[in-house]
């Protein structure tokens, strides 16, 4: 086996092992988040709404406003609201 082949193999193994460690950390974090939602639910909070709030906080104000305007337009088209708000 050539030395270059061995180096490539070692690098590949190192990448794979790093990915595996990160995947395990990701699973642990996901489990922790699930536990927090469970705690919140136990205190009477609606977890679906909490998840929406978390998603909204990730977006900037302009992005949220654009999405809300599009949503209002769709709801109006379906007759679910009177008219989209004037902006």
Curated annotation (Swiss-Prot):
It comes from the Bacteria. Transmembrane segments: none annotated. GO terms for molecular function: DNA binding. Belongs to the UPF0335 family. NCBIfam families: PRK13694.1. This is UPF0335 protein RHE_CH03546.
């Amino acid at each position: 086996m050539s030395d270059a082949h061995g180096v490539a193999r070692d690098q590949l193994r190192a990448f794979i092992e790093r990915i595996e460690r990160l995947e395990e950390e990701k699973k642990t974090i996901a489990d922790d988040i699930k536990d927090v939602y469970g705690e919140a639910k136990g205190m009477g909070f609606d977890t679906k709404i909490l998840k929406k709030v978390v998603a909204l906080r990730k977006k900037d104000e302009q992005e949220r406003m654009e999405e809300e305007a599009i949503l209002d337009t769709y709801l109006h088209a379906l007759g679910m609201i009177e008219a989209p708000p004037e902006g």
